[in-house]
A protein has these predicted regions:
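Small-residue (G/A/S/T)-rich helix-start motifs and N-terminal tracts that mark the onset
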Residues: 1-77
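Conserved beta-alpha-beta core of the PfkB/ribokinase-like small-molecule kinase fold
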Residues: 77-80, 84-130
């Protein structure tokens, strides 16, 4: 698999209902014939009625996920979604790997209108990623 030139990464939150986040991204990647890998930025407890709880993933674990994948399954492209507290970490990782294209799909609010990104994180997103 490490020689597969069609690897897409999703860096996003996990949606326990399967309707969004890394679960949905991986399904889309597969539908387009890509091998998908994921770096989880947040865990959510949610269903079709809304988000009940969000648990951001520590930056050290985000780095560990990146390190685990980068030398074995390097991405052709990265798609980012819900970043929670990981905006600055992702900006640093992308800056250290400038040849990897990144599609930024920032998730600012859930469909049930729960805020998913602070103003400070949004400012960093605008300055360093978008």
């Amino acid at each position: 698999m490490s020689n597969n030139p069609h690897i897409a990464w999703t860096i996003a939150g996990s949606d326990s209902s399967g309707g969004a986040g890394i679960q949905a991204d991986l399904q889309v990647f597969r539908a387009f014939g890509l091998h998908g890998c994921s770096i989880t930025t947040a865990l959510t407890a949610q269903n079709t009625k809304g988000i009940q709880s969000i648990e951001p993933v520590y930056n050290l674990f985000i780095q560990a996920q990146w390190n685990s994948l980068i030398n074995d399954l390097p991405p052709t492209v990265i798609k980012s979604g819900m970043l929670a507290n990981a905006v600055e970490k992702l900006a640093d990782l992308l800056a250290s790997n400038p040849t990897i294209p990144c599609i930024c799909d920032p998730v600012l609010r859930s469909t049930s209108d729960t805020s998913l990104l602070s103003e400070k994180a949004f400012s960093i997103l605008q300055k360093r990623i978008i």
